[in-house]
């Protein structure tokens, strides 16, 4: 079966979001690693833990993309939607708690959030529901 337009758009938006997050992570890596909370985590779990967590997170995002867009997994579709909602809540919470943030990382986070929003919307359009074998 040819992938529907919504699934192709999902791939563009979702992978774009992952790319923006990768750039944002690379740009803020040094600052994040010297953060007092990160230093405490490194002391408790080891200096390798932030890097391992980052690799795990990006791997999970790419696996979910593969299973949703290529393997037609309805579970992956819902996992992406649930993680999106949790990420949105975390983003809003971080804005209210952490105070002023640098403009470029904040801007990249907003762009990533917009791309992820568009990707999740694409997963629940009528042609995408048919792709996953769900009723529209």
Give the location of each predicted region.
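Topology signature of small-to-medium multi-pass alpha-helical membrane proteins
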Residues: 1-136
């Amino acid at each position: 079966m040819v992938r529907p337009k919504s699934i192709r758009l999902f791939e563009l938006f979702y992978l774009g979001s992952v790319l923006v997050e990768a750039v944002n992570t690379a740009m803020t890596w040094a600052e994040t690693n010297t953060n007092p909370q990160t230093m405490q985590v490194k002391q408790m779990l080891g200096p390798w833990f932030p890097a391992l967590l980052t690799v795990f997170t990006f791997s999970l995002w790419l696996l979910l993309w593969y299973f949703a867009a290529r393997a037609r997994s309805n579970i992956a579709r819902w996992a992406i939607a649930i993680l999106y909602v949790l990420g949105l809540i975390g983003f809003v919470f971080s804005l209210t708690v952490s105070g002023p943030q640098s403009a470029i990382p904040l801007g990249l986070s907003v762009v990533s959030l917009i791309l992820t929003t568009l990707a999740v919307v694409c997963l629940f359009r009528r042609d995408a529901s048919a792709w996953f074998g769900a009723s529209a």
